UniProtKB/Swiss-Prot annotation:
<keyword id="KW-0963">Cytoplasm</keyword>
<keyword id="KW-0418">Kinase</keyword>
<dbReference type="InterPro" id="IPR004619">
    <property type="entry name" value="Type_III_PanK"/>
</dbReference>
<protein>
    <recommendedName>
        <fullName>Type III pantothenate kinase</fullName>
        <ecNumber>2.7.1.33</ecNumber>
    </recommendedName>
</protein>
<dbReference type="GO" id="GO:0005737">
    <property type="term" value="C:cytoplasm"/>
</dbReference>
<dbReference type="GO" id="GO:0005524">
    <property type="term" value="F:ATP binding"/>
</dbReference>
<keyword id="KW-0067">ATP-binding</keyword>
<dbReference type="GO" id="GO:0004594">
    <property type="term" value="F:pantothenate kinase activity"/>
</dbReference>
<feature type="active site" description="Proton acceptor">
    <location>
        <position position="102"/>
    </location>
</feature>
<dbReference type="Pfam" id="PF03309">
    <property type="entry name" value="Pan_kinase"/>
</dbReference>
<feature type="binding site">
    <location>
        <position position="181"/>
    </location>
    <ligand>
        <name>substrate</name>
    </ligand>
</feature>
<comment type="similarity">
    <text>Belongs to the type III pantothenate kinase family.</text>
</comment>
<comment type="function">
    <text>Catalyzes the phosphorylation of pantothenate (Pan), the first step in CoA biosynthesis.</text>
</comment>
<comment type="subunit">
    <text>Homodimer.</text>
</comment>
<feature type="binding site">
    <location>
        <begin position="100"/>
        <end position="103"/>
    </location>
    <ligand>
        <name>substrate</name>
    </ligand>
</feature>
<keyword id="KW-0479">Metal-binding</keyword>
<dbReference type="InterPro" id="IPR043129">
    <property type="entry name" value="ATPase_NBD"/>
</dbReference>
């Protein structure tokens, strides 16, 4: 079995899959390396034969995680690294090594699934969008604060905005104008996300008309799902690209 890891800015998304058919044995989201090891170790009858990682962490943090995995499960982790071109997709950055690996792998996965022009909208800690043309040219993209960052900034820099996570969840039952601070903040942030997504969709239409596929991924993708009914929701899109970048037998 293979352990796949997507190490983001705030959390680690993980899953264990069977080598032969990629059937998922288990998975989850954790907030620390130690929690990751504990959750994977708790899976019954799992014997890992490999591990592959995509990380936007520092090199030192990623190396430390690889060492921990080697110690806990006796496997050497393969870490995805930036390249100028792979699987028919050409990196669109002037300095290709500066493109975040999560964005690069999501673009690879999307192009592989779409077999043509595609727009990737990834809504996590940051909201990201990337455009890939029908001939595999990565045309660049956009990054702005995602829901967690918008919420955090308002809570941190506005003294009278204070509420708990349960209140935030209840506030999202509707997007009508808020009648409390928590409703106003949470719904306003969702509308910001939806506006970001709409703008990317219009950009794609200018480029390609209607001849493209939209992919939604990331933990907050459900918040814009109704606004983009034509989009394909692929929660593990980065893992699709990771398997292409780091094949394991």
């Amino acid at each position: 079995m293979i352990l796949e890891l997507d190490c983001g800015n705030s959390f680690i998304k993980w899953r264990v899959i069977h080598v032969a058919d990629a059937v998922i044995e288990g998975g989850g989201i954790v907030d620390s390396d130690q929690a990751l090891v504990a959750e994977v170790a708790a899976l019954a009858s799992v014997r890992l034969t490999g591990c592959r990682i995509v990380s936007v962490r520092s090199e030192e943090e990623t190396d430390a995680l690889c060492a921990l995995i080697a110690q806990a499960f006796a496997v050497q982790a393969r870490v995805a690294h930036p390249v100028r071109e792979m699987a028919g997709v050409r990196n669109g950055y002037d300095d290709y090594q500066r493109l975040g690996m999560d964005r690069w792998l999501a673009a690879l996965g999307a192009f592989h699934l779409a077999k043509g022009a595609c727009l990737v909208i990834d809504l996590g800690t940051a909201a990201k969008a990337d455009f890939v043309s029908a001939d595999g040219e990565h045309l660049g993209g956009y990054i702005c604060p995602g829901m967690p960052l918008m919420r955090s900034q308002l809570r941190t820099h506005t003294r009278r905005i204070r509420y708990d996570d349960a209140s935030a969840e209840r506030a999202l039952n509707s997007l009508s104008p808020g009648r409390s601070t928590v409703e106003a903040v949470e719904r306003g942030c969702v509308l910001m996300l939806q506006g970001f997504a709409y703008t990317q969709l219009e950009q794609a239409r200018v480029l390609w008309g209607e001849e493209f596929t939209v992919f939604l991924t990331g933990g907050d993708a459900p918040l814009v799902r109704e606004a983009l009914p034509q989009a394909r929701v692929v929660p593990d899109l980065v893992f699709v690209g990771l398997a292409m970048a780091c094949p394991l037998d």
